[in-house]
Structures are given as C-alpha cells and as structure tokens.
Amino acid sequence: YIAQKVGSILEEPQQRGLAHFLEHMAFNGTKNFPGDDKGLGVIPWCETVGIKFGTNLNAYTSIDETVYNISNAPIDRTGVLDSCLLILHDWSNYILLKDDEIDKERGVIREEWRSRNSGMLRVYTDLLPTIYQGDKYADCMPIGSIDVINNFPYKDIRDYYHKWYRPDLQGIVIVGDIDVDTVEAKLKAVFADVQKPVNPAERTYYPVTDNKEPIVAIGTDKEVDDPSIEIYFKQDATPDSEKNNVGYLASQYMTSMISSMLNARLSELVQSANPPFTRASSYYSDFFVAKTKEAFALSASR
C-alpha cells in the first residue's frame, strides 16, 4: 500500500473532483511504467504476473486520504517484489499526467459520475452544507463537479499532485510473509530519489464548528423511497498521539460494549410484533464525513 494523507478536502474550488481524477491517472502512465512504446503500463505489467486490476490492484479516494494497493503479488517470482515497489515509487512522485491521457480519462470519470449519481448520493451531498454550516466539509465529496471534470486545464491536476503527493504526507505499508530487513533495504533504495519539497504547503486539518442548538437537516429525492433517520452526538476527535494510551483503549472498549448492548436491544425490537422500524443500529465513528470530529450515532429506517 501507499497511503496519502490527502484527499478531496484539500482541493481548491477549481479542482473539485481532481483528487479522485488523479487516482485514476496513477494507472495511466508513470515514469517506469509509461504504457507506450517505451514499456508496459502499470495495469498490463501487473496482469502479466497475475495481479488483476480491480481485484488485486486498486485504489480509493476519500475526503482526507487516498490509498493505492497491490495485493496477492507472487513475490516468490524473481523481480516481482522489486517491480511492485517501483510502482509504489512512481505513484508517490512520478505519475506522468500526459495531456492526451487526461483527456481520455475525462470520459471515464464522466461515466463514473453518471453511474454514481444516485438519489442517496444527491441527498448526502445536499445535506452537507446544513450539517457543516460554513465549514470546509460542506462541499468536499470526492466525485466533485462535472463542470470541473469537463473543463479543467491540465495545470490544475498537476498543481494538486505536486503540492500534496510528497514524502511527509505518505506512508508505505507492506504486509506478508517477507524478510523484513531485506524488504526494508529494497524500499529505502527504491525511494531514495523521492525528495521532500522545499517549503511545502501546510496540510490543514479542518475543524468542525460546534453548534449551540441542534442542527436539523432533511434531505429528499424522488429515487429515495426508504425513509431513515440518524442522530449524532458530537465530540472532539481523539488526537492520534493518545490512541496508544491505556485510557483510550479502555474507553474504546467501553464504547464498543455500549453499542453492542444497545444494538442487541434494537434487534429485539425489530423482531417484535409491531416494530417501530425495520432496521436500527448504533455506532461510534467519525462525525458524518469529518475526521476532526467524532460522534455517537443512532440510525433507524422503515
């Protein structure tokens, strides 16, 4: 895996959707896997060794992170591990972003945008400005703006890439039956030429404003005929630096127990003669889409 601590939340208004677009471009030509007469692309090379695109080779873009992965690679075969590390290396700083490939991908993204533009997604997107009144999270869905996808100049996606894909915001995760020392040495050698930029932009983690009165958000769409209700009880997110503390782990265990017991009671209600809902659950997680706020949530639907 190569995990980027960046996502659609860091896009400028004219870049809405380009974090996700960039994820697509990572498979359309890199320095060592150009996908032209100079060499195989990432997908064709992976498929020559049995790594199937969509199953063992994939990526996702969310609001605060973007993650690429290669899994079930046959590393017992000579050179496969080295080549997989080279792909991660290229994704980190050497995606080609050629003009013609960008233009070809616009059509792919348009189709994905069309197929994903469901009633539930529209409701979800429409609710964000009410839930996050005035906050950055009010307009941050990774699928972005179709107008931007159709018309953005090439420079905008390159600016996003070179501004945010950099070593201090990246992590490499390797899991498997490997010799740790050998793989670590290979990793350091492969990534030796990837340098942190001078005076990099600050990676801001946008806060969620507290509210004095309850926020009520109602979303409707003609395609959504399964009514549901959710209630969130917000609180500040736990800093990452505290998540290895015994106190935090004990608190998480207690919260998990509370959710389990409450879910058991909700399940009993669902199975009663005349239940008030057909599905219900409780959970503790990020507040809707924001990682800088957490919430205990209850949801129910008919």
Regions found by a protein language model. Give the residues of each.
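M16/MPP (pitrilysin/insulinase) zinc-metallopeptidase core fold and M16-derived inactive scaffolds
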Residues: 1-71, 122-123, 139-143, 260-294
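Histidine-acidic residue clusters that define the catalytic metal-binding segment
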Residues: 68-71, 78, 86, 126-170, ...
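M16/insulysin-pitrilysin zinc metalloprotease superfamily fold
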Residues: 29, 70-105, 287-302
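Short acidic/His-enriched helical or mixed secondary-structure segments at domain edges of catalytic enzymes
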Residues: 108-126, 130, 208-226, 268, ...
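Acidic/histidine-enriched alpha-helical segments
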Residues: 38-44, 95-114, 125, 179, ...
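An aromatic/glycine/proline-enriched structural segment found at the starts
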Residues: 171-227
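Non-catalytic, conformational "gating/processing" segments within enzyme and secreted inhibitor domains
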Residues: 106, 120, 124, 154-188
